[in-house]
Amino acid sequence: MLIGFFVAPAYDFWLARQRYEYKYNLAGSLTAITALLASLCAVMIVLHMNAKELSDVANGRLYASNIVSYIVYGILWFIIIFRGKTFFNKEYWKFSLQLSIPLIGYALAAQVLSVSDRMMISRMVDNSAVGIYSTLYTVSSISLLVWSAINASFIPYLYQNIESDKNEIKKYSLLLMGAYAIVAALLTFFAPEIVRTLATEEYYEAIYIMPPIAGGVFLTCVSNMYSNIMIYYKKTQYIMYASIAAAATNVALNYFCIAKFGYMAAAYTTLVAYIVLALGEAVCAHVVCKKERGANYEVYNDKAVGLMAVMAILLCLSGLIWYQYAVLRYGIIIAGCAVGAVLGYRVIKMRKVKQ
């Protein structure tokens, strides 16, 4: 792990630069090749250890897959160091620390926001409730994989155009939000099928916690969009403030609501906490933009973003109704897929134009 902590940032920095320069083919190829080689190496080691009847196969598999990744990361580390020809630069370190130290507070608060509900359910209810809640929380969060990819592609475009007076960022951001809202909603409507496939019948009884969790998870895209602005203007302390407020809200609400309404209440307290996070970061970003660019400047169409966020949450929560009507639910899923395809096509078309 220590070796990984040392060399993995080189890969992250390299990947961020490739995305910023729109070199997705190279980044995607290296990522895919590394993953393939790591998987093949792990399989070969496991088969060899089983054939030799060796113990500790799990550690063998772990070392095999990680060694391949760390070799790739190490090569990139040496390339970056060689090209930079500098190990320590006071100006760079000062800039990085000023930008990153508040984000440590954000990361800690985000971790509290993410796991506090499960820890409190364990203490206030029982471990079986934790198992059910954790499984459905994980399923509800699958859409974050989609948003992570979207956000990674959007950040370079945002930072290259944020100083422009054009309104293209407003249009592009709403398209991306709309596409992600469709993904989050469709995942919510597919909840019965997903839970039946991945879990036992006792988990199915708790599918009604998925809509509020999915609505809260969707708001991650709103908070990320506004936190991107604060990172650009080097005001990361505001990100920390908003995340601490959200984490504190979640812990306080869980303390009272889980005891009174049971573990399912944690899904709704999570939604409220994410609303606090998104709203807090939107307000902070507005304050930062006002200081940096003037009172009337806004990067996004804030009213449209707020309206879309409300609509997305309501759409996710409507799953509480549609779970009882399979035919109507499938009809909504088909319509959502069609709308998602149209939005996805428009996003891809705009991305090609920007490149």
Task: Name every feature range the model reports, one short phrase each.
Residues V46-N50, L108-I142, P192-E202, K260:
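Helix-terminus/linker motif at the lipid-water interface of multi-pass membrane proteins
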Residues S65, S69, A246-T249, E298-V353:
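Transmembrane alpha-helical segments of multi-pass transport proteins
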Residues S55-N59, F95-L99, L103, I121-S141, ...:
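Interfacial/gating helices of multi-pass transporter permease domains
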Residues V7-S29, G215-A245:
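Membrane-interface junctions at transmembrane-helix termini in multi-pass inner-membrane proteins
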Residues L40-M49, I75-L76, W147, K170-T220, ...:
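Alpha-helical transmembrane segments of multi-pass membrane transport and lipid-handling proteins
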Residues L136-K166, K170-S173, S227-Y232:
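Helix-loop junctions and terminal segments of transmembrane helices
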Residues L54-L62, I71-S114, S153, Y157-N167, ...:
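Interhelical loop/hinge segments that connect adjacent transmembrane helices in multipass membrane
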Residues G28-R83, A245-T249, Y263-A285, I332-I333:
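Hydrophobic alpha-helical transmembrane segments
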